Amino acid sequence: MVLATLGSSPFVGNKHGTGEPNVLALHGWGRSGSDFDRVLVGTNALALHLPGFGSAGAPPEAWSPGDYAEHLASALVGHCQVTLVGHSFGGRVAIRLAARYPHLVQSLVLTGVPLIKRTAAKKAPVPFRLAKRARSLGILSESRMDILRNRYGSADYRNAQGVMRGVLVAAIGEDYFADAAQIDVPVTMVWGEWDQPAPLAGAQKALEYFPHATLRVVPGAFQLLEGNLEQELAVALHDALNA
């Protein structure tokens, strides 16, 4: 796979096709642009390795999905309009970009995007809550607090390093329905029936907000881009490009 940059920007990704990319694929948390290798067959596309993932260096500070969108918008100045394909975290970025910079976006194809702000199923364990309080008072050291975060945090949080922990915290504290209502381009949502990180109910709710959206449910599929979900995403992308 050939690596290429997005224009003269530092954004790098896997290049598909020989023409100027009119598809920009944005991967999920902890993943890379290589997730889209089969989805993008037959297209002119760039599957980015977002900063902090794959072969890309981490951002200089804890970027929110909106920050990723702002930097991508700068990189797309002078570029043709693109169809954004967003999976999970990449879909968060795609929605922010389409809402804030509609002139840059032709259409959206989304899958497995956590559209609703995550709420804790239960309170954090008492020792962790006490530790957070102690840290806020300056009683507990940051190194000790980090040990407790590793013990009590989610798998994604434990696996994230350095600034990427801040990126994760920023992302899970957001929802996207207000932005969805501002997006006037066609939106195709392709969802696994049993997606747990981004439940189908969130996508169904989003239909009330996106002005021009359709939802394709893939029976038996979960969140990872594999099997029938991967195939249906490729079909949806080609349909969007040929619309």
Where in this protein do the model-derived segments appear?
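Alpha/beta-hydrolase fold catalytic core
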Residues: M1-V23, L40-N44, V77, Q106, ...
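Active-site loop/oxyanion-hole signature of alpha/beta-hydrolase fold enzymes
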Residues: S9, A47-V85, V235
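Conserved HGGG/HGGXW glycine-rich cap/lid loop of the alpha/beta-hydrolase fold
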Residues: N14-G57
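Gly/Ala-rich beta-loop-alpha elbow adjacent to hydrolase catalytic centers
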Residues: G86-G90, A94
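Flexible "cap/lid" loop of the alpha/beta hydrolase fold
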Residues: I95-R100, L104-L137
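Conserved alpha/beta-hydrolase catalytic His-Asp/Glu region
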Residues: K132-V185
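Short beta-strand/loop motif that positions the catalytic acidic residue
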Residues: I183, M189-W191, D195
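Catalytic histidine-centered segment of alpha/beta-hydrolase-like enzymes
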Residues: A221-E232
